[in-house]
Amino acid sequence: MKKYFSLLIMLAVTIGQAEKLSYNATEGTLISVDVSPDGKQIAFDLLGHIYTMSINGGKATAITKGTSWNMFPRYSPDGKKIMFTSDRSGSDDLWVYDFYNAEFTNVTKMKLPVHQGTWSTDGRHVFGTALNMKVRHPVYMFNMYGDKQEIIPVG
């Protein structure tokens, strides 16, 4: 009887109807926030996704979707892109979302997880840290197209 009941539950779960879940969040914890260079928008992470909204409040627009975990949004100096940490490639990398063409680009493409991204003042490079046992607290510099990386000596 126990096996039969378990089989019924598995069958119900397998062929059950999918339901769309939605929620309204009015507060959160451990949220990373960045203000756009023009001071009109904010970007923030909540429950593993990146959102933007007016600095005056209102409805947030999701930049990321799906099952990946996304965090630490940072506007580019010109405000046309947002960099963030995401595991969408299987490991934490720095990704950039371009508002103009709505495309995502993996900037780091490393075997090591990369975190704590920040932009160069001209927006042509991003910097991030990675846990590399060969180098103490390495800071990596990446150009925006991911074809060059170098370790920046720290302290």
Segments and roles (model prediction):
Residues 2-8:
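Sec-dependent signal peptide recognition
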Residues 22-53:
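Beta-strand-rich domains and repeat architectures in extracellular enzymes and scaffolds
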Residues 9-17:
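Hydrophobic h-region of N-terminal signal peptides that target proteins for export
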Residues 27, 45-51, 59, 65-71, ...:
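A flexible loop/linker signature enriched in serine peptidases of the S9 family
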Residues 38-40, 78-80, 122-124:
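Short coil/turn segments that connect the beta-strands within blades of beta-propeller domains
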